């Protein structure tokens, strides 16, 4: 789960911006009512419902119902050239560890935001809040 409450608040704010109504968090995710999360969300905590749940159980249920489950990985398929569904669930990884092997096994499609850096010594990865914004923007652009 997301460890930094500020990142969770940013994700809630971005979700609100893109019209996402529900966020599902694993039990080890930062607390939505942490003051840092509340501040970073800029009020989005009152518009985006946050559910703390057992993610593997939830993902299994959603997959059985036919809902696509996307995961974000450094080695996934390029989000700009991959076919995307108009509905589904997007799993964002933990800041330090990414998505766990257990959750990875439940994702139907692995996505990545490609780097356009000029050299190999550039930034290794994106902040999870920034990555969430880019991912949601691309999904919404294609709708």
Cite the ranges covered by each PLM segment:
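Short flexible/disordered coil segments
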Residues: 66, 87-94, 132-142
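Short, flexible micro-motifs
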Residues: 4, 12, 46, 74, ...
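Active-site/ligand-binding-proximal alpha/beta "capping" segment
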Residues: 70-123
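Structured adenosyl-cofactor binding patch, chiefly the S-adenosyl-L-methionine
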Residues: 17, 32-43, 101-143
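Short glycine-rich loop/turn motifs that provide flexible caps or phosphate-binding loops at active sites
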Residues: 8, 42-43, 70, 92, ...
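RNA substrate-binding interface of SAM-dependent RNA methyltransferases
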Residues: 1-75
